[in-house]
Regions:
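Helix-rich, well-folded core regions that mediate interactions or catalysis
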Residues: 1-175
């Protein structure tokens, strides 16, 4: 029942999000930063200039698949997209929220700069429609693929360096 659905969500739709390393989450967050550079450059620039920890805030959004951040109806629509499209739907939703509500961040004084305004009051239909915008769809898919490829390359590099240090290679011991 419900537990099987949760296990499937964690294992298949969000691989690496809920394990001890959270590597899948870190890859998605790297992609998210790149997606925002493409889809909301002014907002991304302000976040960087203000030193706003997007990674820290997005952790809750992505791990909890927006259950604690969006109105329930919007969350359920995002989940529909997640089940259909996979984790890229979470990046598209976040990019859509920044696109729709980025003006609130751009106009906010730095002393009250709060990322929660991005998701507050999101209209369910509007956030889903915006997340399906071709520019957002392409940016999210491209940046997630790039981040995943970089992660695989880095993991291979680290594994190879570890094998060299221990004196082993793929074919066994060297020497």
């Amino acid at each position: 029942g419900a537990f099987a659905l949760l296990a499937s969500l964690c294992d298949h739709l969000l691989p690496g999000f809920h394990d001890t390393t959270m590597e899948g989450l870190h890859v998605a967050q790297a992609a998210l930063a790149s997606v925002l550079q493409v889809t909301a450059p002014a907002v991304h620039q302000k976040l960087s200039a203000e030193g706003v920890p997007l990674k820290e805030q997005s952790t809750s959004w992505l791990l909890c698949v927006f259950i604690d951040a969006l109105p329930l109806e919007a969350t359920l629509r995002v989940w529909d997209l997640l089940f259909h499209d996979g984790q890229v739907a979470l990046l598209r939703t976040t990019a859509a929220a920044f696109h729709l509500n980025g003006h609130s961040l751009l106009n906010a004084p730095s002393e009250i700069f709060d990322l929660r305004v991005v998701l507050e009051g999101c209209d369910p239909g509007e956030i889903v429609a915006t997340s399906l915008d071709p520019i957002i769809q392409e940016a999210a898919a491209d940046e997630l693929a790039k981040a995943q490829q970089l992660h695989v390359q880095e993991a291979s590099r680290v594994k190879y360096q570890g094998a060299e240090r221990s004196g082993t290679r793929a074919g066994g011991r060297t020497g």
